[in-house]
From Swiss-Prot:
Protein name as it appears in the record: Methionyl-tRNA formyltransferase
Keywords: Protein biosynthesis, Transferase
PANTHER family: METHIONYL-TRNA FORMYLTRANSFERASE, METHIONYL-TRNA FORMYLTRANSFERASE, MITOCHONDRIAL
CDD domains: FMT_core_Met-tRNA-FMT_N, Met_tRNA_FMT_C
Gene: fmt
InterPro entries noted in UniProt: Fmt, Formyl_trans_C, Formyl_transf_N, Formyl_transf_N_sf, Formyl_transferase-like_C_sf, GART_AS, Met-tRNA-FMT_C, Met-tRNA-FMT_N
Sample GO molecular function, one term: methionyl-tRNA formyltransferase activity
Amino acid sequence: MRVIYFGTPEFSRIILEKIYDHLNIIGIVTQPDKPKGRGKKILPSPVKQFAINKGITVYQPEKLKGNIEFFNIIKDLKPDALIVASYGKIIPEDILNIPPYGGINVHASILPKYRGAAPIERALMNCEKETGVSIMKMEKGLDTGPVYAIKKIPILPDDDKGTLSIKLANLGADLLLEVLPLIKEGKLIPVPQDESLASYAPKLTKEEEIINWNMDGEKICCQIRALSPEPGAMTFFRGKILKVFKANFEKRFFDEDVINGTIIEQDRKKGIGVKVENGILWLLELQPEGKKKMNFLEFMNGYRLNIGERFE
């Protein structure tokens, strides 16, 4: 099968690497290079880096809609299918209609739940216990096309955006390789999504990165997991930004009236204990403004915390 692959982040690179030896990948389309990290260096996407290493031609159009030059490039390559995984732009219908098998998308959710750009983050943020991948026939709507296959996995208590992305990328690649021969042979007919069950997963906003210490402790934990390993959940301590990347929640009831966000315990095994709505949030991995990530012991030793101090 002659395939043009559309993808950008690490999630997409893992899928590409896994399917590479099984398909004839004749071109790769990825987002234009963007500034990344503290130094804001212009860096290629993980998918582009893989393509360069393998000597595959890379295309990085700024826009797709109305781009006649790009349309003709895809047409001239005569692909059998476009495979898309976290590309980051909506692919116009005229491009999807070029190959006989159209566009086939690997989406990191159990469709029709969590359509959109951030299904992994949203599933974690909402404390879901299960997620999965869907292989979908693409159409002009955002993740609205009929579904070829779905595979589900549990979300474990210690899963974060990083670990779950890797699991779902591997799951998606395996499922894709399973269904592609069936699609080619006409043995697999995609099933339309139930619109009444649809939900959306827009990118997380900057406001959603800020910890509200008055929230349910389990919800704060889910927020931290959804934002780890980057960009991190944000709070303020001693007037500066502090990011939290790992925490555990312990349900506990308090007699005394302690303000949420207050440090109430320091335990060299459990972490930094912060009072939240219905218990204690044990902070385990943190990053003070302008410094590297550190574990709670390094933070405790470096900052000499006082019981009664508050995160705001």
